[in-house]
């Protein structure tokens, strides 16, 4: 019974996160922190632009609160909004900006290089951007861009690297954007991957995606 409750809560939080992700596009939405209290449910929304989450005269936050209560069965939702202090070190925000640029017709290489410069310029120890899908033709491929230090697998990768996955809807199809960032304040273990100061690109083609 406890396991079912735990799984149910995780599913609900995931659904709420997806709802906020689509509803708060202009706010630079990052993530939520959901905690149950004796008097209800406290939901902290982290975003680049808190004003867009609140809305004019609190209209948006009221709409969010009502939707959480009626459509997601959240008990007495109390929404708190916090600003992301370093948006260029937040993988969700960085990934969303890349996806938005791709949807506006920007070239994926130029967009990825620009994002990497912003991330590293904000003091990150390392960054990895993976763009996957039909980028410029009928054949799907994966492009990888990296700079700085990055741990790709194992427990250190889980503990030290923040990761986010976003989607861009293009004319040729949906493109996935994965961003990994190692922030300035992490303590690096001895086993690390050292990359050169230049951004590297790796192309991988998927034969199964040909149509």
From Swiss-Prot:
| Gene Ontology terms describing biological process | translation
Tell me what this protein is called.
Small ribosomal subunit protein uS3
Q: What keyword terms does UniProt attach to this protein?
A: Ribonucleoprotein, Ribosomal protein, RNA-binding, rRNA-binding
- PROSITE patterns registered for this protein in UniProt: KH_TYPE_2 (PS50823), RIBOSOMAL_S3 (PS00548)
Q: Write one Gene Ontology MF term.
A: structural constituent of ribosome
* Residues covered by the KH type-2 domain: 16-85
CDD domains (UniProt xref): KH-II_30S_S3_arch
Write down the Pfam families for this protein, in alphabetical order. Answer: KH_2, Ribosomal_S3_C
One GO location term (cellular component): cytosolic small ribosomal subunit
Tell me where on the tree of life, at the top rank, the source sits: Archaea
How is this protein organized at the quaternary level?
Part of the 30S ribosomal subunit.
Q: Which InterPro entries does this chain map to?
A: KH_dom, KH_dom-like_a/b, KH_dom_type_2, KH_sf_prok-type, Ribosomal_S3_C_sf, Ribosomal_uS3_arc, Ribosomal_uS3_C, Ribosomal_uS3_CS
For this chain, the family text in UniProt reads:
Belongs to the universal ribosomal protein uS3 family.
UniProt organism field? Methanococcus maripaludis (strain C7 / ATCC BAA-1331)
What does the UniProt function comment say about this protein?
Answer: Binds the lower part of the 30S subunit head.
């Amino acid at each position: 019974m406890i396991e079912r409750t735990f799984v149910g809560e995780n599913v609900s939080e995931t659904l709420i996160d997806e709802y906020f992700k689509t509803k708060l596009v202009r706010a630079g939405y990052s993530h939520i922190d959901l905690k149950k209290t004796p008097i209800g449910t406290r939901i902290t929304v982290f975003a680049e632009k808190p004003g867009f989450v609140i809305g004019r005269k609190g209209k948006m936050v009221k709409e969010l609160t009502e939707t959480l209560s009626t459509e997601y069965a959240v008990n007495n939702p109390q929404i708190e909004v916090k600003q992301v202090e370093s948006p260029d070190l937040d993988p969700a925000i960085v990934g969303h900006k890349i996806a938005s640029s791709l949807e506006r017709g920007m070239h994926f290489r130029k967009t990825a290089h620009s994002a990497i410069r912003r991330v590293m310029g904000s003091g990150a120890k390392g960054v990895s951007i993976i763009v996957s899908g039909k980028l410029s033709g009928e054949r799907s491929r994966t492009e990888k861009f990296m700079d700085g230090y990055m741990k790709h697998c194992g427990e250190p990768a889980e503990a030290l690297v923040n990761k986010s996955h976003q989607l861009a809807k293009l004319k040729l199809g949906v493109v996935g954007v994965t961003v990994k960032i190692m922030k300035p304040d992490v303590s690096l273990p001895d086993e690390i991957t050292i990359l050169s100061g230049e951004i590297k690109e790796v192309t991988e083609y998927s034969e199964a995606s040909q149509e």
